A protein has these predicted regions:
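N-terminal accessory segment detector
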Residues: 1-135
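Active-site helix/loop of acyl-thioester processing domains in fatty-acid/polyketide metabolism
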Residues: 137-152
Length: 153
């Protein structure tokens, strides 16, 4: 069996275990291994195959749950940065405007007092960011886990 030690693949396998069980996770891991030494083309091919697998085997809600758990970090550093803007602002609207004026890695959109839209302007994922092709939207759902981690702080 090929080596499966890439962090992206390990997170996907763990998420599959938690969401749909060991059998499906093991099936995925055996069929789609990814080594941490994989080059950018191999990583992109793996990400595309992962999206195809998810879309062929699960409904949209389950794909959302699986990918959401594949986030790359806990969001603490971004949460701390956002908190600095929030603590200096007199209102949510001011917080959003100040953040957007000074930061470019993400954008905020004020919806209401209890809702803010958080958006990355591009994909920062090491599996896909340097390949000039696009993936299914399923790949992007990990950002929901990132945003959840950021705002949980």
């Amino acid at each position: 069996m090929a080596k499966n030690d890439n962090a992206h693949s390990l997170r996907m396998v763990e998420s599959l275990k938690q969401t749909v069980g060991n059998d499906r996770a093991n099936e995925f891991e055996e069929k789609y291994p990814l080594s941490k030494s994989a080059d950018i083309e191999k990583k992109f091919e793996w990400a595309k195959a992962a999206c195809d697998y998810l879309e062929e085997n699960f409904d949209a809600e389950l794909i959302y749950k699986i990918r959401k758990e594949c986030r790359c970090n806990d969001g603490k550093s971004i949460a701390n940065k956002i908190l600095k803007y929030l603590n200096k602002a007199n209102s949510i609207e001011e917080f959003v405007a100040s953040f957007n004026a000074k930061e470019s890695f993400a954008k905020l959109e004020y919806i209401s007092d209890n809702k803010i839209l958080f958006c990355y302007p591009e994909c920062y994922c090491a599996c896909v960011k340097r390949v000039p092709q696009q993936l299914s939207r399923a790949w992007c759902y990990c950002t929901l886990g990132n945003a959840e981690g950021i705002f949980a702080e």
